[in-house]
Amino acid sequence: MATYVIGDLQGCLTPLVQLLEQINYQPQLDKLWFAGDLINRGEESLETLRFIKSLGSNATIVLGNHDLHLLAVSHGYGKLKRGDTLAEILTASDRDDLMNWLRQQPLFHYDEQLNTVMTHAGIPPCWDLAKTQSLAKEVEKKLKSDSVDDFFATMYGNTPDTWSDELTGLDRLRAITNYLTRMRFCDENSKLDLKSKEGINTAEKGFAPWFNYPSKVPEDCHIVFGHWAALEGKTQLERIHALDTGCVWGGSLTALRLEDKQRFSTPCTLNRKNS
């Protein structure tokens, strides 16, 4: 039995099928983790969502910012952006079933036996493992509730950009969501810079990648995340694993086998909507 963590798919089903063949995926034995951003920008978003849903209990998913964007648009909030490839999902006959399934998915996953935690963007320096799990559950509870519309109506935005335990209501939920699904750079106080999106050397003065600061997560716990294609899968830290290797941009799709930390990848052709 093996557990594989797979980076951002963004609607690229063909490379996923190729990668599963490469690792000789055995459904009766192996488990798959997906680090979020299952859909959007790639041309196979609907097929990708259906495929991952069909994996059932074999697949463990955390939501990414593109997945939340799809949910917000499906609820009538937010607008389709240039380059989005969500229209086919939004007009699909099984749209409601897919959306109901998607909003049941978590933002945080921790496996005690493998001593590995997964979120889409990472874990800020100011949170320990228990706090991250607890805060993620606040958003997950809202996503599953009948009052989710007010969350989607106020989900977009870059503030509050600094965590405080005193935050309440929708501001609190937006901050949690931004840390778990949009974070790249922060300062020593975990203040977010959500405008810089490129490589490590592009940080604004006083900011650095979140994983460059001392972490409150135990040193023997591994952190796996996606979201940041410009890292090209590299953090220079043995226990922190970046898995977005730019599949939709013509890079590669990467899987990390958790039992021995071996990486597998398959090259991708540019699979992005030309707009």
PLM segments and residue spans:
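N-terminal active-site segment of His-dependent metallophosphoesterases
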Residues: 1-51, 55, 68
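Active-site-proximal beta-strand elements of phosphoester/diester hydrolases
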Residues: 2-10, 116-122, 242-243
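Residue-level marker for buried hydrophobic side chains located in beta-strands
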Residues: 5, 34, 61-62, 117, ...
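Divalent metal-coordination and catalytic microenvironments
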Residues: 8, 37, 64-65, 102, ...
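Active-site environment of divalent metal-dependent phosphoester hydrolases
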Residues: 12-13, 40-42, 66-72, 126, ...
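A general structural motif
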Residues: 27-30, 56-58, 118, 220
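Active-site neighborhood of divalent metal-dependent phosphoester bond hydrolases
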Residues: 46-48, 54-169
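Acidic, His/Gly-rich catalytic cores of divalent-metal-dependent hydrolytic chemistry
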Residues: 133-275
